[in-house]
Amino acid sequence: MIWNPNKECMSRDEMHALQSKRLQNLVTYVYHNVPFYRNKMQAMDIAPEAIESIDDIVKLPFTTKQDLRDNYPYSLQAAPPSEIVRVHASSGTTGNPTIVGYTRKDLAVWSEVMARCLTAYGITRDDTFSVSYGYGLFTGGLGAHYGVENLGATVIPTSTGNTEKHIRLIRDLGISGIACTPSYALYLAETLEKMGLKREDISLRIGAFGAEPWTENMRKEIEERLGLKAYNLYGLSEIMGPGVSYECSEQNGSHICEDHFYPEIISPDTLEQLPYGEQGELVFTTLTKEGMPLLRYRTKDLCTLMPGECACGRTTVRMGRIVGRSDDMLIIRGINVFPSQVESVILEMQEF
């Protein structure tokens, strides 16, 4: 199932033209409304008129997490306060939280891309869906919530906590879909078993998991213990929240909503753009965001990008599984090692 075939199945030439137009509009918008970007572009001797197509994105400056912290709370905001209708924030555990303002159009885009994700997973308006991410400043809860409503399914805003009650609701209400972190899904499975229930006692069939790293081994365990199909859901608070990319039934990478979020892969060392298929740092430009648009935001996430039409019918670029972060890589005897690889090995050991 495809929510928006006009965008998700767009030809590459049409997508290139759309992205080019949106990038031109974005650059003009931030140049005139965000002093941070205007100063950066002037220092690089780049005028908005120099950006003629999406291919010119390499001329533009990067944005980093530190830039967001240095401009706390609202210096990167492009829309006037009167147009900001909601604010979310990151945890800020290592400094100032990242404050992200959303306009009404931003929220409409967010619910649209989340509806694409849920439809790709197989959720329909006939489903009852539990949103078990945290609500509040964290983007997970409300992001998934309004996507479910946009799709037309019934949303149960369970959030987190009181897991036994949650399981009873899943059983009694016939909840068929759930969005939560993969670690909470495993805790749900553990609690289900402690309550003396089996996976056959509940009706979960689809799970959307994200907001933290997880492995293929975790996917297999979640599917086996909860009796559902587990899908990856990717997003960042700085970019939008959940809904930036999503797996389809083929589960061969995650489709990026690239009409709204333009992806690049760069070398963390040289900052040069890398070709499709090469592993590097994932970078996003928010092509349509009004509240706090970002140019070439360095996510620090390491993955690959995969072009080409998918067997599901979608034509959007896919991103591979996140293998680690450019800021947590260890070099052991000349080999790059990521914590996620260690976790994968540990999970294969039965005693764990």
Predicted region positions:
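Nucleotide 5′-phosphate-binding alpha/beta core
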Residues: 1-89, 94-112, 119-120, 125
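Active-site glycine/GP-rich loop and adjacent strand/helix microenvironment
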Residues: 2-14, 18-31, 35, 151-352
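Generic structural marker for isolated residues within well-ordered, non-membrane alpha-helices
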Residues: 37, 87, 114, 145, ...
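Acidic/glycine-enriched edge-of-secondary-structure segments
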Residues: 95-109, 145-154, 175-179
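Short, solvent-exposed beta-strand edge segments and adjacent coil->beta transition regions
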Residues: 97, 128, 327-329
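Short glycine-enriched loops at secondary-structure junctions
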Residues: 107, 134-136, 183-184
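Conserved ATP-dependent adenylate/AMP-binding module captured primarily in the ANL superfamily
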Residues: 111-128, 162-175
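Conserved AMP-binding loop of ANL adenylate-forming enzymes
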Residues: 119-155
